[in-house]
Structures are given as structure tokens and as C-alpha cells.
Amino acid sequence: MIVRNLVLSAVLAATATAFQPHAPLLSRPSSASRNMNRPTTKSSNLVMRDFPKPNVEDTDNYRFASEMSNSFKTTLKADPSQKKKVAIIGGGLAGLSCAKYLSDAGHEATIYEARDVLGGKVSAWQDEDGDWIETGLHIFFGAYPNVMNMFDELNIHDRLQWKIHQMIFAMQELPGEFTSFDFIPGIPAPFNFGLAILMNQKMLTLPEKIQTAPPLIPMLIEGQSFIDAQDELSVTEFMRKYGMPERINEEVFIAMAKALDFIDPDRLSMTVVLTAMNRFLNESNGLQMAFLDGNQSDRLCKPMTDYVEKRGGSVKLNAPLKEIVTNDDGSINHLLLRSGEKIEAEEYVSAMPVDIVKRMLPKKWQNMPYFRQLDELEGIPVINLHMWFDRKLKAVDHLCFSRSPLLSVYADMSVTCKEYADPDKSMLELVFAPCSPLAGGNINWIGKSDEEIIDATMGELARLFPTEIANDEKWPATSEQGPNGQAKLLKYSVVKVPRSVYAAIPGKFEQNLFSQCSS
């Protein structure tokens, strides 16, 4: 659907699991003081190991993405006489991707970003110590065809650090221990996924595994039509309707819901979970994960910016939008920035997150049925944490699903990422979710102080690393730690995103414009 002079929801770039969106207003991080007289610690025996890039190109989804991308350079390529000046509001991945494809099609794209950094949900900046602070913890799945194709076209595939084909979970009932789904090379989907689950002996019993499979068979046979029909059900309602074991919720679905939408499974539409599962189950390398080898600003956003600028486009930072000024007939006359500058273009694209779009809609548009659909969408808050410790914690070179009441996923970035590598100290990056009643949480953590959030997180880490986290009087949640724990927190950052991805609650999929645009 194309709206005159405005294309809403520009090219939506698929990003990683812990998925913070474009956020014009973020709380800047706080830092605990460094302990410069800390004792010397032994280096970790764990060595970062990257794996060869999987064959992500050999899927129908990738081929389709590649064909669509190539069409901008060929069949959709504008004649020089038809070249248009396009203003893009928002410099997240959506805005950068939109500018890239418009440049391929021969148009002049200019991005107007409100903040002083690009990337939106993948933005990053340096603190006073020179350490990088990221808006969100991101990984890249093999089943992200648009992003994989983008990396190929930008010639930056070598910046992805592919990890072993596994999914790693913390064991709630066995603090300090982990278990995994191991994908055996050479076995095609969906059999590799099924075998990985069958081989794991710590999460579900064999009867529970057998009981889980039948409700998912219609998804494989009927595909998206069955998936879309489940939108009226939450994850937990779907489980009970189809007789799935209750423990599948505790063992798997809670982790999936919090990773996909920062929300508890009793609040999340089953369509979201089934859509992800269907993609992963149908692509042999779909669940293999990669980390970016450094900060997202330099390693991802900069090559996208360079690509656009080399083709005549431009990027404007610190250029927040004040108003979309319309003509009497409702068409756009110009954009008005907060600086007072007027921006005139032939076409205008919104690459803003839904809550910002709702605030910026001109009065003439607000009662249009198309835009009224935005009323149904509300962003979910999420918090991203960086925590530097004075020594190495027990770590894995991978993403970990914490299965914690407060934490979604985390990674020891000193092990998983080349730029952040440190043989002596751990730096954990964690996604704190759910953090509001809307998402199923009991506490509005977005309204809490940074110190309260970190203290609660230290309590969860004490459970995950019971023999390693020290009893530290700075953090009351660690007061029950025994004498063996030695690791203390040196520094932290707290990045709050009050409005993140929209809440995909049951019954909203068929009503909203995003489902219409994707069909």
C-alpha cells in the first residue's frame, strides 16, 4: 500500500534476537567507579572460536531477497530524468536500508536522524572511558535473508563471527549449569531441529517431547495460513488448546517470548512464535547465530552510510523532526525540523518507530482508517545492560538464554566479540525483560533507578554464577553469596528504551497495517 508522498514503514531491516528498536530518547548510562587496585587474575582458558559462514544463500527466502534487491538496480532503476529527491525520517536500520535501496534505484536519498548517532535499535556510542555502549544486544540468525543479502552487497560478511550451531540455556533448577540444543552438521531441516531437541536430556522428558510435536505439524503442512489463524491465542492459550505439556512453557516458550518481543508468553500472540519457528524449522542453517565483530556504529552503520553517500545521498544527524506540514488536500508540503529548517522533497519516507509516528501524524491524517490502525500498537519498554567485572566468569562463546524472571538473553562480550575481547575480565551484555506490567512484569522497572536495576540483576547473576559472584555490600541482592564467590562489579551502564518493539498481543495481527503491508 502506497500513500501519496509518504511511504510508512520503510524497508524493515531484520536484526538480532534481543532487538531494541530505534529510540530517539534513551537514558544515558551510569557507571560504577573502576577499582584500579584490583588483584591480578588468571586468564580464562576459554578461547574465542569462530566457525565458517554457513550456506545461508541456498534457501528460497534468500534467493527471493536477492532478486528483490537486484531489482532496484535493474528493472526498478530510474532513468536520470526520473530521479527523485527523497527525504527519509529516521536513521535506524530501516532508514539506512531504505536509503541504500533508493540509491540503488537511482534516486537521491537524504536521511534525517534526530540523535547524534545512527542505527536506532543498533546504535552505539563511547563512554568517557572509551568503552562502547550499545542500545541492544544483537545477534544475526542465518534465517535473516534480507540482512544476509545486505551484508553480501556491502561486502562485510567477514565482520560476522559465526558461532557453533547451538542454542544454550541456563538451567534454572541447577544454578551454574547450562544445557544446549546441538545441531548436527549435514542433517537438513526440519530433522536437525527435531534431533537437537531429542538429544537434549535435561530440559524435557521423552513423553513431553512427543506431546509437544503434534500441535506443530499443521504449521509445517499448512504454513502461514495456519500460523495467521492462531493470532487470537496467546502462547499459553495455544499450548493448552492443543494439549502441549505445561513444562514446555517454562523450558522453552518463556525464553522465546522474551527474546522475540520482551514479553511473557501469556501476553504474546502465538502467531509471532510460530512465524519464527516455521522459518527456523524450514532452513537448515536458520538457527545458527553470528555476532558482529565490533561496535555496531563502525562495523554496520558506517558501511551503509558510506554506500549511500558514494551514490549521491546524504545523512543528517541532530536533525529532529518537529512537524509534517501538509497542504489543504492532505498531501505533504514540507518537513519542519526543530531547528526551523524546512525540508522539501519529491517523496517522503517515515522510518520512525510506531510510537513516534503516532505523535508526528498531521491532524488531517489522524482520522484516516489507514492511520487509525496505529492506535492498536503500543511499544514495549526494554532495558539493555553492560556489566564489567574484575575477573572472568564462567562463560560460553555464544548467546545464552538465561530463563531468568528478569533477564532475557545475555552474552559475555569479552569472549564472543573480537573488539571487546579481554582474557582477564568479563563484560556481560544483558537484556532486562520484561520490565513493565504491559509485558507481564510485576514491577515497572523502567521507572526504577539504575542502581535498583543493577542490584536486581546482580541477584540474578548470583543465581546463574553461584560460585563466582562475590558478596558485595554495594549490592544487597548478593548478600547470601558464599565465600567462594570473588567476582565484583567494576562498572556498569543502563540503557532504557521506554518504547521498543510494539506489543504483539493476541488479536492484533489481522487488524494492523503491518500485516497488510507484508501480504
Task: List where the protein language model places each region.
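Helical element adjacent to the flavin cofactor pocket in flavoenzyme catalytic cores
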Residues: 274-347, 351
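Mid-domain catalytic core of redox enzymes
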Residues: 60, 82, 319-441, 451-465
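Mobile amphipathic helical/loop "lid" adjacent to a hydrophobic cofactor/ligand pocket
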Residues: 147-148, 152-153, 157-274, 282
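Conserved flavin/dinucleotide-binding core of flavoenzymes
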Residues: 49-75, 397-401, 406-519
